[in-house]
Amino acid sequence: MLQISHLYADYGGKPALEDINLTLESGELLVVLGPSGCGKTTLLNLIAGFVPYQHGSIQLAGKRIEGPGAERGVVFQNEGLLPWRNVQDNVAFGLQLAGIEKMQRLEIAHQMLKKVGLEGAEKRYIWQLSDGQRQRVGIARALAANPQLLLLDEPFGAQDAFTRDQMQTLLLKLWQETGKQVLLITHDIEEAVFMATELVLLSSGPGRVLERLRLNFARRFVAGESSRSIKSDPQFIAMREYVLSRVFEQREAFS
């Protein structure tokens, strides 16, 4: 379980987050949404252990987070892949740093690539892949170390609509299959409503928790309903419009 208590953080000398209290249970998919500058990415960086926080506590499985750790896998918006390594070696890179024997790490990389639909692409290089394929490699790399918590920072923001839908449904299938805790940062309202089991709305900066919404559209998808059917459901449309109105309220307040 991820537990965040009374978290305060600065960014560039200015308050970025103020009194954040969140809990992410095992098997849940929490999405954080808010206007630009609300501290979404700062929150993810704090959970990942990339930057320090000023006050409060972040704990995973009862242990305080005070730096990066293998129990947290991160997928970045720009993938962060190594162009001089092939696909398999990119996925296995973290395992290599952890001292895992070569044959074992290559087998793990192969299994992760199979999970994300890239079996057979092991020897290709990053520049030979589409944007969507690169993001699949990033997800496979994050999963390779078998983390307790998967963190994703607007991973599909640069994708076209068709690829974005593919990646959203892939992530939901992986979430169901692995049972991992997932925290997704996004600026896409439809994506947030579709994917979240719990949606957290942040206020304009400094970010505060404005509202928490329990949603079931992701569970409907993994139970077998199509994404198209869900996104055309009047209940989905009504929730999307409600969330849109809340985000616009914050944008107007910020301006």
From Swiss-Prot:
GO terms for molecular function: ABC-type taurine transporter transporter activity; ATP binding; ATP hydrolysis activity. ATP binds at residues 34-41. This is Taurine import ATP-binding protein TauB. Part of the ABC transporter complex TauABC involved in taurine import. Responsible for energy coupling to the transport system. Keywords: ATP-binding, Cell inner membrane, Cell membrane, Membrane, Nucleotide-binding, Translocase, Transport. InterPro entries: AAA+_ATPase, ABC_transporter-like_ATP-bd, ABC_transporter_ATP-bind, P-loop_NTPase. Residues 2-229 form the ABC transporter domain.
